[in-house]
């Protein structure tokens, strides 16, 4: 077999180019049998196809002394090469390169030796020279088949497979219908001769049908190739040799430039790939050095042959920081180095929203080997610096707490002020004599960015519509939202594919990239489903299937199903949590399916509610871990004196009637109301020690820091109680969150932040007393650019909001200095909650409609 294999090169032995073939001579060059062939060059205006051929059939393509393959090249004007197979591979790759714009005609028969019946079915079609050569090679392979059913396998890049699938699978479906062939695109279990980024198009049927399908498939693949520039196909031995060299210790180049070796310890700064060498020194992309090669080992250089020039730059150019530079040069980097032992020491210096002590070191070289933490940054990537710094990074002056409070009031009033009105609150009891000072609670930046992941199922036939031609739709979704979208592989006996949306988010971000992406994907799936059922008439309902980790199902279900029941009532959609046994094969056994059925607006609103709860759950878990570490460093503030028995209300008023006394609680606004960004709160009294509405196994309720009486969402409610059972916030969590009495009723909120649906009002406990919430007033701050979605056309949305919820909705003019509008919603808790949900839905629907200006087709 090896004796008959043919290797082609782009030049003759004399070095002259053969104009007759268009690609050079086909004479064989003697090489070692283990040496791989060099990569083939695809000239401008040419297309390339890769056809898989079993080892047993290679001889039919090559022929004796290469006669067959030579005749094919001469008759088609194509470059045809049989690649060397990897060790143990049962297949070989046949690479075909020819002109894409030149036309030729081929006969679609069984083969050149077809019988009379086959000749009757022959038809002639016009194809390019590249397609014609592909058909000719396939005819040789089909002649070697032992049965009437033949299989053709094409290798293609992952980005080109979408062209074969088409929008919503329409292209591959039409080819199947026209030819009667079985066509599948495989991502897994590929032969070892395929590249890592390849997919395989497999066509099965009789010879005539497969050739017809091959014409259509090759046309799709040819149209998406970049024929206007030179490309490389085939084996890449230089790249493989280069990647293998990364695992060998190469220290000569870097040591010639550096007087001493540079060590990277596990706590120090791990350089990114593009920060290791000066720009323009590496011949390939920046991914030539994997991250793991920089961890716990000497910094290694790439082989000198892979560099365009010898690295003779100084240390600052090579490593982007001067190892032995003075302090001022070291501070030119974007990230400050702070000793770890100073990060958690109490201080009056505020760095961002965190209390830290910035201790100066005289030895800048020693700081390179100390643990450090990145400077907190906001959603726009800007550092949280609230004071000027000199050239050495030292604060020029320290802010007093009074100054901090005044500035934070304006800063916090704008953060999380948009549509942040879910009524979560927590009550504390203060000692009535002390008036201490409350330091601002630890910022969410200390929690760090969290990966927010949402998953949704889609049918296999609609997956192509989400991916788009060459991944166009996925790239646009990423560009629009910033989230990463991954469409899972197709599995046997599974009619669905899993779409995972991932985004790194911070609790301070006012919008969720992952949530926006999942809503756009759902709208896209609805559009695809609608286009396919136009012939069957309108459809009254649609089903969406979200995939939720089993560990997070509780925040969707709620205690006794109270949360999911409330969402069903609010959205009007049927929400069902399926058992693990009903999971499709494409999802893990650690996940469960949340199935939502209803009309499109209702299902979309339900998805918004569910993903909002899942996102809050991610950050609340992180906040709990952070608060457990930092609670000892915080102090609390007593808000009212010993004689006051009135609860504290910030931003909103809620009437509470006590069945025993039939009297209303008094309200007053705190001078520290900046803790509530949207100025909306739910005010009611209860004793923390005997609170029957918080599960004892969950010591920190959702969105609350018991150490500072602070909610991680600035727009949440902040209340104090006036119970006689006073306690101090410095007590252990086990005392603050005692087990509830066995007969205690279920109240307004649970640990997941859900709402009960009591018809007669919400029963609230305060020690041995009870109170019923009869009326709630909530203020919501809405940006001016979103008000058009609230009003709707000719005020239709606003009118619907009032009629459906039954709440009283008043829109106030914007205050001085801001364009945000204040929407006041009042009514029973059920009415206000329904109005808030509808308000969220209207704004989200408007934002989604604006996204249609992006061509997602």
Curated annotation (Swiss-Prot):
Major localisation: nucleus
The organism's taxonomic lineage, starting at the top: Eukaryota, Viridiplantae, Streptophyta, Embryophyta, Tracheophyta
UniProt feature, compositional bias: Basic and acidic residues: 1-15, 718-730
Species annotation: Arabidopsis thaliana (Mouse-ear cress)
Effect of a null allele: Floral organ defects such as reproductive-to-perianth organ transformation and loss of floral determinacy.
Alphabetic keyword roster: Developmental protein, Differentiation, Flowering, mRNA processing, Nucleus, Repeat, RNA-binding
The keyword RNA-binding is assigned to this record: yes
Chain's role: Functions in floral reproductive organ identity in the third whorl and floral determinacy specification by specifically promoting the processing of AGAMOUS (AG) pre-mRNA. Functions in association with HUA1 and HUA2.
Protein name per the record: KH domain-containing protein HEN4
Cellular location(s): Nucleus speckle
Skewed-composition ranges (Polar residues): 645-665, 673-688
């Amino acid at each position: 077999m090896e004796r008959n294999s043919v290797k082609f090169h782009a030049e003759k032995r004399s070095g002259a180019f053969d104009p007759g073939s268009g690609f050079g001579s086909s004479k064989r060059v003697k090489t070692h049998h283990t040496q791989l062939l060099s990569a083939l060059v695809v000239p401008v205006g040419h297309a390339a196809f890769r056809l898989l051929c079993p080892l047993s059939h290679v001889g039919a393509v090559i022929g004796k002394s290469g006669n067959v393959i030579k005749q094919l090249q001469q008759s088609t004007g194509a470059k045809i090469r049989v690649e060397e197979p990897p060790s143990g591979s049962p297949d070989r790759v046949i690479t075909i390169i020819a002109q894409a714009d030149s036309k030729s005609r081929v006969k679609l028969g069984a083969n050149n030796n077809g019988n009379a019946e086959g000749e009757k079915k022959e038809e002639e079609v016009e194809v390019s020279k590249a397609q014609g050569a592909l058909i000719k090679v396939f005819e040789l392979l089909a002649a070697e088949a032992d049965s009437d059913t033949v299989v053709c396998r094409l290798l293609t890049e992952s980005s080109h497979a979408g062209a074969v699938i088409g929008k919503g699978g329409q292209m591959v479906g039409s080819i199947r219908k026209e030819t009667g062939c079985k066509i599948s695109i495989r991502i897994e279990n590929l032969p070892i001769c395929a590249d890592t980024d390849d997919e395989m198009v497999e066509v099965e049927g009789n010879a005539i049908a497969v050739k017809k399908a091959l014409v259509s498939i090759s046309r799709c693949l040819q149209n998406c190739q970049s024929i206007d520039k030179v490309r490389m196909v085939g084996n890449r031995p230089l790249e493989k040799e280069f990647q293998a060299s990364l695992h060998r210790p190469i220290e000569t180049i870097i040591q010639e430039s550096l007087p001493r070796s540079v060590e990277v310890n596990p706590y120090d700064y791990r350089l990114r790939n593009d920060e290791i060498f000066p720009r323009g020194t590496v011949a390939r992309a920046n991914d030539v050095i994997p991250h793991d090669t920089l961890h716990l080992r000497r910094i290694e250089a790439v082989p000198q042959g892979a560099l365009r020039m010898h690295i003779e730059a100084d240390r600052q150019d090579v490593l982007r920081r001067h190892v032995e530079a003075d302090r001022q040069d070291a501070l030119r980097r974007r990230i400050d180095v702070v000793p770890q032992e100073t990060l958690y020491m109490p201080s009056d210096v505020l760095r961002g929203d965190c209390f830290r002590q910035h201790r100066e070191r005289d030895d800048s070289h020693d700081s390179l080997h100390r643990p450090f933490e990145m400077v907190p940054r906001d959603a726009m990537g800007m550092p949280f610096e609230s004071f000027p710094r000199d050239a050495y990074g030292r604060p020029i002056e320290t802010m007093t707490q009074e100054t901090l409070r005044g500035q934070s009031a304006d800063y916090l009033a704008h953060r999380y002020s948009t549509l942040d009105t879910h009524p979560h609150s927590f009550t504390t009891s203060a000692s009535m004599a002390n008036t201490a000072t409350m330091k601002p609670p630890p910022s969410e930046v200390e929690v760090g960015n969290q990966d927010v992941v949402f998953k949704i199922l889609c049918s296999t036939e609609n997956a192509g519509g989400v991916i788009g031609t060459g991944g166009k739709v996925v790239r646009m979704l990423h560009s629009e939202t910033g989230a990463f979208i991954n469409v899972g592989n197709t599995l046997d006996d599974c009619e669905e594919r899993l779409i995972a949306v991932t985004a790194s988010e911070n609790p301070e971000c006012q919008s969720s990239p992952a949530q926006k992406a999942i809503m756009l994907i759902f709208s896209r799936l609805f559009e695809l489903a609608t286009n396919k059922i136009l012939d069957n008439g309108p459809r009254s309902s649609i089903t969406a299937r979200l995939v939720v980790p089993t560990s997070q199902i509780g925040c969707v279900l709620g205690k006794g199903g109270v949360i999911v029941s409330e969402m069903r009532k609010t959205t009007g959609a049927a929400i069902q949590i399926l058992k693990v046994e009903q999971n499709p094969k494409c999802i893990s056994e650690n996940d469960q399916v949340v199935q939502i059925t209803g009309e499109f607006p209702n299902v979309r609103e339900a998805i918004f509610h569910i993903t909002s709860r899942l996102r809050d759950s991610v950050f609340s878990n992180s906040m709990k871990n952070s608060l457990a570490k930092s609670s000892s460093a915080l102090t609390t503030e007593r808000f009212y004196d010993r004689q006051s028995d009135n609860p504290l209300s910030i931003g909103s008023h809620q009437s509470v009637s006590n069945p025993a006394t039939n009297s209303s609680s008094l309200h007053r606004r705190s001078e520290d109301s900046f803790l509530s960004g949207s100025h909306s709160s739910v005010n009611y009294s209860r004793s923390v020690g005997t609170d029957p509405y918080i599960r004892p196994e969950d010591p920190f309720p959702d969105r609350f820091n018991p150490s500072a009486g602070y909610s991680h969402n600035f727009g949440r409610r902040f209340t104090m109680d006036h119970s006689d059972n006073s306690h101090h916030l410095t007590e252990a969590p086990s005392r603050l969150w005692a087990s509830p009495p066995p007969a205690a009723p279920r109240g307004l909120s649970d640990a997941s932040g859900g709402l009960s649906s009591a018809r007669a009002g919400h029963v609230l406990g305060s020690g041995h007393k009870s109170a019923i919430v009869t009326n709630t007033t909530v203020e919501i701050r809405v940006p001016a650019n979103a008000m058009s979605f609230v009003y709707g056309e000719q005020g239709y949305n606003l009118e619907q909001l009032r009629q459906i919820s039954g709440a009283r909705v008043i829109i106030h003019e914007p205050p001085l200095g801001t364009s945000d509008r204040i929407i006041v919603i009042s009514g029973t808790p059920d009415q206000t909650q329904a109005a808030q949900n509808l308000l969220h839905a209207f704004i989200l629907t408007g934002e989604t409609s604006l996204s249609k200006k992006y061509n997602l087709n």
